[in-house]
Amino acid sequence: MNVKPKLPKGFRDFDSKTLEKREYIIKIISDVFKSYSFQKIETPSVESIETLSGKYGDEADRLIFKILNSGNYLSDYDLNNNADYKELTRFISKKALRYDLTVPLARYISQNINNISFPFKRYQIQNVWRADKPQKGRFREFMQCDADIIGSKNLINEYELVRIYDKVFEKLNLPGTIISINSRKILTAVSTKLNVEDKFSEFVNLLDKYDKIGKINFIEELKNFNISKEDSDFLIKIIENPDIDYIKSYLSEFGISSEGFDECKYIFEKLKLTSNFCEIKFNFKLARGLDYYTGTIFEVENSKVKIGALGGGGRYDNLTSIFGNNELSGVGISFGLDRIYYCLSELSLFKSSNELNKTLFLNFGERELNYNLKVLDVFRDSGISATI
């Protein structure tokens, strides 16, 4: 029987021209990482379920690609008995494809902690998998390009990671790039004022959807949190006109403070000392959904191409504690290669591709062939691409 060749939804092949453009982006990113003294590591595509589960929040946990165990593990179960399914679930899968590169990094550090010098500056460029609904710019297999600094709480690390973002997009010459900065601590302080601490995850997820659902729908959904009209008006004001000093002053009237304000201001003060290619701004409604961020959070978008985040990251103080290391604080960023590729393509910013074969030797006979074979080696040994 003939099988129709097709790919599963959300997965792709890449031809040589596409790969050449992707490798152009990867080289720029990795070169910038190296210039900031980051070391490259790699981790396996497969991690244990217990390593990944519970680190990303309930919504993200559902997107983890689980791998069925091998063997005839169904032989002892009555598949017609619904009661067996609950018992069976925990035996079906004990491994999964990695969802991101950060949690595997925490596992890697915990396993190799005695062989690592801290602060540990690592970068990693590998594929990740998410069982998400495929759409424009969103795939089930895609490459992440991460840089993390582990073992230091110094805010200069946040500054350097923002500079890495800025430097990469400058080298890519991608106009309209916006780097947004916020703090999970500021969001926590605001949620305290609004009395929604017990629904913090739901609150920040709604905040993160503000641009997508619009002001009217946002206000309507706020009613689910029993927020007063006064507090609702305050929230809309700081969403539309975010100012760190205003938010800090307002909350202080109620005895609520947060070091997140001072941390963000420190980063912006340091960024004023440099010439920045990207627009860098404070964005109160930035509330990245991953549960492990505890401090500063970042996100990168492009105003000229609407495709979502080109990158993101933040500070995570407790991630390695799940593996028994309580003192390790970390901060990291990630580049979304596919979306960056899409932006460069949409804006026609890729340089014209050089021909793969820069030198062509013609064969007019056996004598000429013998001569060409010798000269071909000379060209190739000199780094010049050639074919016959």
Model-derived features: where do they sit?
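N-terminal targeting/leader regions
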Residues: 2-15, 201-250
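Acidic, His- and aromatic-enriched active-site or binding-groove loops in soluble protein domains
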Residues: 60-76, 195-222, 302-303
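Short, surface-exposed recognition loops or helix-turn segments adjacent to catalytic cores
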Residues: 176-186, 203, 281-287
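Positively charged, Gly/Ser-enriched RNA/tRNA-binding surfaces
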Residues: 21-37, 47-48, 83-92, 100-114, ...
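Proline- and acidic/polar-enriched loop/turn elements at helix boundaries
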Residues: 45-46, 181, 203, 234
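TRNA-binding/sensing appendages of the translation machinery
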Residues: 1-99, 103, 159-163, 180
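Terminal amphipathic helices with adjacent charged low-complexity linkers/tails
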Residues: 186-188, 195
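Short low-complexity, flexible loop/linker segments enriched in glycine and/or proline
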Residues: 55-59, 193-195, 296-298
